[in-house]
């Protein structure tokens, strides 16, 4: 909902139905319907009320009527949801040690992949404060290329590979639509414009604002993303259980990443800490560019791409020299201070 509830408290008209309440806002032409098997009169009372030993159901729909039998439909949805996750976790290779913790962690990671596109988001909500009152409340409901590598690695370690294939399609779609440099993060649909805004009319978690939507980091230059993208998808190109290496588009995608690494080896960036006000040379960025070249070398050798192998070798040598130079600068800076 694009208005983020800004206009709902003003001009919102609750309309009472037989088993629902319809909230309409004529200013923005939007409606929300709450359908329930509870007495509707309860919702118009100022007193609190308690349900004892009964299952009751509430369904919130956006501008649509809920026409099915509410109890049966909700129970059916619940059963199907539980069954889906039980089947998924049964397919995971999880040892007995810390099994409970690993299962819960795996479910959380899986829940953060948007099934329609393969995007993996860093958080399911926005603006939880890093520390109460600090003002460092950010919107992480986006797909960070860097973070996706670690999520996919964790999932493949427990035998889940479909997530990697879905993410590969997501990244391929982004690079096809936007042949320029890779951003550090994208929206779940691959959208690149993530302008940051503060919502002053929301108080935030435990009144520790501000509440932000969007993230300015989409404008940052973070050159480690090319290496991160390459190694995140490396198993797809080198593991014989996957067929992606037989796709002719693979060669073009890997060369695209190598081109970006070649163009940004000596470039300053915002680094892993996403500094908002200045750019510098960062060992981390150069290291992952080197890792990306090593991954390209493995892909080239396994699939017989001689031109790619030669190109990756040249970039590896250049990147090695650049990394040494950056580390030397860092050592001198530490001694100076």
Where are these regions (language model features)?
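Acidic, mature catalytic/reactive cores of soluble proteins
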Residues: 1-337
